[in-house]
Regions:
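Sec-exported extracytoplasmic/periplasmic mature domains
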Residues: 95, 99, 118, 192, ...
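Stable alpha-helical elements in mature extracytoplasmic
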Residues: 86, 90, 109, 113, ...
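N-terminal hydrophobic or amphipathic helices and topogenic motifs
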Residues: 2-3, 11, 19-112, 118-120, ...
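A ligand-binding cleft/hinge motif common to bilobed small-molecule-binding domains
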Residues: 126-138, 212-237
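Short helix-initiation/N-cap motifs at beta->coil->alpha
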Residues: 104-115, 199-211, 246-247
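Periplasmic-binding protein-like
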Residues: 71-77, 149-157, 233-273, 283-309
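Bilobed "Venus flytrap"/periplasmic-binding protein-like clamshell domains
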Residues: 67, 73-95, 130, 152-211, ...
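Acidic, polar ligand-binding/catalytic clefts
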Residues: 107, 111-168
Length: 313
């Protein structure tokens, strides 16, 4: 309520207080105590619905919902503002590609991301291979294009540690991203006994994970092999587990998009025309010059890493 409205309410009260006894009767003839009558008058004036125009962003979302727009999203790894900067150009590019309105929607939290995904609220998604695999198996999504470099993870400790297997690290501290990050889920999958699970010290950024192990903050860490090669030029780390290579992050599309439109999206994202609209996305995730064609088969089975995450199975 603005200052002008506050003065109106105040002056109204000054006028009506002398007549509170007469206000204390409602339309049915029953009596209300004077102060309750005044409170009712305040509530009616102060909390009546505003006729002001909705906020610009709310209005855009309302219009999008009314038009049944195709919803494009990605995990909440960025702030809403950063997400808009990275993904909005992609959404606009895809709108032109299929001739339908595609809107980018930031999920806000991982909980909202999971909930909306499971109920089919997202039509086009860019995220990790385990999520792509899950949507393919459970939500009838098709995987269209991917980051060309394959993913390998390494579980690391300092060389001087007398550890040679992951099993020896049960119950010990690990610097890692919070689940459901794929690297962390790969690590947790190595421990079947819940009472022997490692202690995850939530750490954002592969460089910070490496630094946490190097400084002794954590006994171990999990990082992509490609990142380890870049960080550990001095050879300070020992690899106690190296995963098999798996496909990388990818775009998937759901059943609200026809097979024809899904093909158009894949072709568009691989075309030279995508260079500008996807530039910030490719820079943020070090994709390289372009994406690569993907298929469902290569992602099959990776959803198993979500097996012990709440809500998926």
């Amino acid at each position: 309520m603005n200052i002008k409205s506050t003065w109106v309410v105040f002056l109204t009260l000054l006028f009506f207080i002398p007549f509170a006894p007469s206000l204390a009767a409602d339309s049915s003839g029953t009596s209300m105590p004077p102060m309750q009558a005044i409170a009712a008058a305040i509530k009616k004036v102060a909390f009546s619905p505003s006729s002001s125009t909705p906020a610009k962003n709310d209005l855009k979302e309302h219009i999008a919902e009314q038009q049944e727009a195709i919803v494009f999203t990605a995990p909440p790894r960025e702030t809403p503002e950063q997400g808009m900067e990275i993904y909005k150009p992609v959404a606009e590019f895809l709108s032109k590609t299929i001739g339908e309105r595609v809107v980018y929607k930031h999920p806000g939290t991982w909980g909202v991301y999971r909930t909306e995904m499971l109920k089919g609220g997202y039509d086009i998604v860019f995220d990790g291979p385990h999520f792509n695999s899950y949507r393919m198996e459970k939500l009838s999504h098709n995987i269209l294009v991917k980051m060309p470099e394959r993913f390998e993870f390494a579980v690391i400790v300092l060389k001087e540690q007398k550890i040679s297997t992951v099993a020896q690290m049960a119950g010990r501290t690990f610097c890692a991203h919070a689940p459901p990050n794929l690297g962390t889920l790969v690590l947790l999958s190595q421990f079947d006994n819940p009472s022997r699970q490692p202690v995850i010290i939530s750490t954002n950024g592969w460089d910070n994970i490496y630094a946490g192990v190097a400084s002794g903050k954590c006994l171990g860490g999990v990082v992509p092999v490609a990142n380890l090669k870049k960080y550990d030029r001095a050879g300070n780390m020992k690899v106690v587990l190296k995963t098999q290579a798996m496909p990388n992050q990818a775009f998937s599309a759901g059943p609200r998009l026809s097979a024809e439109d899904q093909t158009k999206i894949a072709q568009a994202l691989l075309s030279p025309d995508a260079a500008g609209p996807t530039a910030k996305l490719r820079a943020a995730y070090k994709v390289g010059d372009s994406f690569a064609l993907a298929n469902n088969q290569e992602y099959r089975g990776l959803a198993e890493f979500l097996r012990n995450e709440w809500g998926y199975y």
